[in-house]
A protein has these predicted regions:
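N-terminal capping segment at the start of a domain
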Residues: 3-54
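Buried hydrophobic positions in well-ordered alpha/beta secondary-structure cores of metabolic enzymes
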Residues: 36, 63-67, 99
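Short hydrophobic/aromatic-rich motifs at helix boundaries and adjacent loops
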Residues: 1-2, 32-36, 86-91, 116
């Protein structure tokens, strides 16, 4: 794929930003990875807002709080899905960009050489 000069400038600026904030990014990622957010749907009467269990609810709350601290509007769809919006002002478009992710993880098995939820960076 060939980038235009403007696109290349954007990629370069993003790379410089990431390099300048790498330590913060790694710290925040490690904090997130400490949640043992294994989906647990075994409870026939889950707590409201926690259909996938309490650990997934905890990581949802963490991400909702982080987005709020960063000034981003959020919406929690009863613990099934969350939405974090990057508001654009004075942008005339009907198109959105969506990043889809999940916050639950697979169970840790016995193949780990250290605690799966204690990231080492």
């Amino acid at each position: 794929m060939t980038l235009t000069a403007t696109e290349r400038d954007l990629v370069d600026a993003a790379s410089r930003w990431f390099d300048a904030h790498r330590a913060q990014f790694v710290d925040e990622l490690c904090e997130l990875l400490r949640y043992p957010s294994v989906s647990d749907e075994s409870d026939p009467n889950p707590r409201p807002g926690a259909p996938y269990g309490p650990e997934v609810r905890r990581v949802f709350d963490h991400m909702l709080a982080k987005a709020g601290r960063d000034g981003l509007p959020t919406r929690d769809y009863t613990g099934h899905v969350m939405e974090v919006v990057y508001p654009q002002e004075n942008v005339e478009t009907d198109r959105d960009i969506a990043f889809v992710d999940h916050l639950d993880v697979v169970p840790a098995d016995d193949g780990w050489t250290h605690d799966a939820f204690d990231p080492q960076a």
